[in-house]
Design a protein with these regions (language model features):
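ATP-binding glycine-rich loop module of kinase domains
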Residues: 245-274, 293-308
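Helix-rich C-terminal or lid/interface subdomains of diverse kinases
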Residues: 228, 316, 354-364, 441-442, ...
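Conserved kinase catalytic-core helix
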Residues: 150-151, 278-283, 303-402, 491-492
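Conserved core of the sugar-phosphate nucleotidyltransferase
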Residues: 110-195
Length: 544
């Protein structure tokens, strides 16, 4: 017996969630949807996976996550446009499914599945769930005609295409057991040749042909449909297996048993990350494997550095990385470094802020109060960044060996050392180096704006005609830790804390396009503009 999962479709109902990857790779909690499916089945069951839209992402992930599983991959040449359909996609796997098998949609999650449907069977069945939604196809069943074994199944009476009422019926959830596989494939071929079936819906096959005389219905007690935006949101809300991270649609972090698997949609990113990693691996968790779009390392039992953080440990962390050479100066062409620095701080930030202003139709053409601080209209973000680059600290910036997300949320403490988890592929066009001041700016950002507060909506933003009020909940250690960071950068590197604070503001401004339609977006913008203004005024006073 085999398990057949089709992942070839484009997932159009999921909009931007499938812009950069396959719908089976959408993350719910710690895992992508396809892992929730596979993990519900016995480890010795052979998998047949159809691949199409971003199929290479699915294959790379499964090879890393399940290296010991027997998996047959079936590439579907036409998964979008004329001639494509679920029927066509399934037919591509026919030669690999010449025995009884279970078919499972790649957007259907059922918990405790082995307790509800048979893994070994001698009849054909459809799996359904009681719901009032009219979005789904359904089938009627004879409640008085049921088996007496562990898995109660009922005589299936009739199928319906999206009926007006589901009273007394079960919604088809995209799981079925095919025992009479020869008859199944015969009917699939008939359906494919029938013009009425040139649609994406394989349920039409069951609806038209009724498939088998002994087709039975099995009812499950839970079901999550991740094939639409509302279903994904509900699944993420209910998921108990979760961790704090602000997700991006083109990147992902998965935890699969004893592995951490990171995903990067853009080709070339992983190659650059590996090149950078080879220079700074003493500070990182060792990479165990990687592919074109994924890298993998072992999950270790260590505290996230932000847990139980306190001023003593914070200062210890800063000194640990200083003493071990994380911020040692590197020899690099100064002209190249300065060009990359300008593009990173100026071009990138202005591009991000322009995206934000265009999206929200916001102009900087009048005075504004943020938290009752007057910011004159002359102090646009573009103007303030221009003034920032005239600072002696900007001009004297030294190239160092690390570039990444130097924040407590992306750092582990194993009792002996601190481990960095999130290094970046490059500092503009420089792969192996970065700007130490950016690291301090990111850490300063994290002390105020941490994942826990952001993910749990522990922030406020109130907009009035000429005044905006913003705040975010911070832990009680933050004020003292910021003072420690201030002393650290001023004492060890002779850098103004206001300069670091300005970089923090740049970080916030640059994050805004990542969270359009999320209240975090405006919070970051107004926090960033206020911090830019206050830091710039203080820097000017220092230099006068």
């Amino acid at each position: 017996m085999k398990l057949f999962i089709t992942t070839s479709g484009i997932g159009s109902r999921l909009l931007d969630l499938t812009k950069y990857t396959n719908k089976s790779m959408i993350k719910i909690g710690k895992k992508p949807v396809i892992s929730y499916i596979i993990d519900e089945y016995p480890e010795d069951i052979e998998l047949v996976i159809s691949l199409g839209y971003y199929g290479d992402h699915v294959k790379q992930y499964l090879d890393l996550a399940y290296p010991n599983r027997k998996i047959t991959y079936v590439w579907v040449d036409n998964y979008d446009g004329p001639g494509s359909s679920q029927v066509y996609s399934q037919l591509q796997a026919e030669q690999y499914l010449q025995e009884p098998f279970i078919y499972h949609d790649c957007d259907t999650i059922v918990e405790n599945l082995q307790d509800q449907i048979p893994m070994d069977f001698d009849y054909n069945f459809l799996v359904g769930y009681e719901t009032n939604s009219e979005l789904y196809d359904a089938f009627d069943y004879d409640i008085n005609n049921k088996t007496k074994d562990k898995f109660e199944s009922y005589k299936l009476i009739k199928t319906y295409m999206k009926p007006d009422s589901l009273v007394g019926m079960l919604s088809f959830i995209g799981i079925c057991g095919i025992y009479d596989y020869k008859t199944f494939w015969e009917n699939m071929h008939k359906a494919y040749e029938d013009e009425r079936f040139k649609t994406p819906y394989d349920f039409l096959v069951y609806h038209e042909y009724q498939m088998f005389d002994d087709l039975r219905a099995i009812k499950v007690n839970n079901w999550t449909d991740t094939g639409n935006i509302a279903g994904v949101k509900e699944a993420r809300k209910k998921c108990k297996d979760n961790f704090f991270i602000l997700d991006k649609i083109d990147q992902g972090i998965f935890i699969i048993k004893d592995k951490v698997i990171k995903f990067f949609a853009k080709d070339g990113v992983v190659d650059n990350l590996i090149t950078h990693y080879n220079k700074i691996n003493q500070f990182c968790q060792p990479i165990t494997n990687y592919t074109k779009n994924f890298l993998c390392y072992d999950f270790i039992d260590a505290d996230n550095a932000i847990n139980n953080m306190n001023p003593v440990r914070f200062e210890k962390m800063l000194n640990y990385f200083k003493d071990n050479g994380l911020w040692e100066s590197q020899n690099v062409d100064n002209n190249l470094f300065n060009k990359c620095k300008d593009k990173f701080y100026i071009n990138k930030t202005l591009d991000r802020v322009n995206q934000f202003k265009e999206f929200y139709n916001i102009n900087e053409d009048k005075d504004i109060y943020i938290n009752d601080v007057l910011i004159p209209k002359e102090y646009t973000i573009e103007y303030m960044i221009s003034e920032f680059t005239k600072s002696k600290y900007y001009k004297e910036t030294k190239c160092t060996g690390w570039h990444g997300d130097f924040v407590l949320d992306n750092m582990l403490w194993d009792g002996n050392k601190f481990i960095l988890l999130d290094w970046r592929e490059k500092f503009d066009n420089i792969i192996e180096y970065g700007d130490m001041n950016y690291d301090f700016g990111k850490m300063n950002h994290n002390l105020t704006f941490n994942f826990s507060s952001a993910c749990n909506d522990l922030f406020t933003i109130k907009e009035y005609e000429d005044n905006v009020y913003v705040s975010i909940l911070a832990d009680n250690y933050v004020y003292e830790c910021r003072n420690i960071l201030k002393r650290f950068v001023e004492t060890n590197y002779n850098i103004s804390y206001d300069y670091i604070n300005f970089i923090t503001a740049i970080c916030w401004i640059s994050m805004t396009p990542l969270y359009f339609l999320n209240p975090l977006c405006k919070l970051l913008f107004y926090m960033g503009k206020l911090t830019m203004y206050q830091s710039l005024i203080n820097m000017k006073k220092e230099e006068d």
